[in-house]
Amino acid sequence: MSTAVTEGIEVTVRSTFRPERSEPGRFLFSYSVRVVNQGEAPAQLVSRHWIIVDANGEREEVVGDGVVGQQPHLEPGEHFEYTSFCVLKTPHGSMRGTYRMVRDDGQAFDATIAPFPLVVPGSLN
C-alpha cells in the first residue's frame, strides 16, 4: 500500500496479485485507488501518468485522459475510488505516477501517486 498527499489531494493505492488471470511470463495485478480531496477547494482529475517497472528494470509509461473513462470532480471532503489492472512479464515490480488535477479557478498541479509494489506472494523469498 502507498499513500501520498499533494496540495490536499490524498492518493492511496493497494495492489493484489491475480493468479486466476496470470500465466508463466504474464503476471496480472489489480490495483485499487482512492483519491480524497482533503483540501478546501474543488479539484478535477483530468489525466494520469503511470510509470511501471518490472524486476528486469524494464520501464513502461502510460499517459491518458482521466481514469477508467472518467474525469472525477471532487468537492472538499469527497472521494473517488476505482480498480484497474497491470500486467508484468516478471513476478514483481512497482508502479508510481501522478494525476493531473485542475482546480475550478484553472490552477493545475500534479498529485503524486507514491510507489507501490506489485509482488507475487513468495516470489521475493
Swiss-Prot record:
Signal sequence coordinates: none
Domain ApaG per the UniProt entry, residue ranges: 3-125
InterPro entries (UniProt xref): ApaG-like, ApaG_domain, ApaG_sf, Uncharacterised_ApaG
Highest taxon listed in the record's lineage: Bacteria
Entries under PANTHER family matching the protein: OS05G0170800 PROTEIN (PTHR47191:SF2)
Protein name (record): Protein ApaG
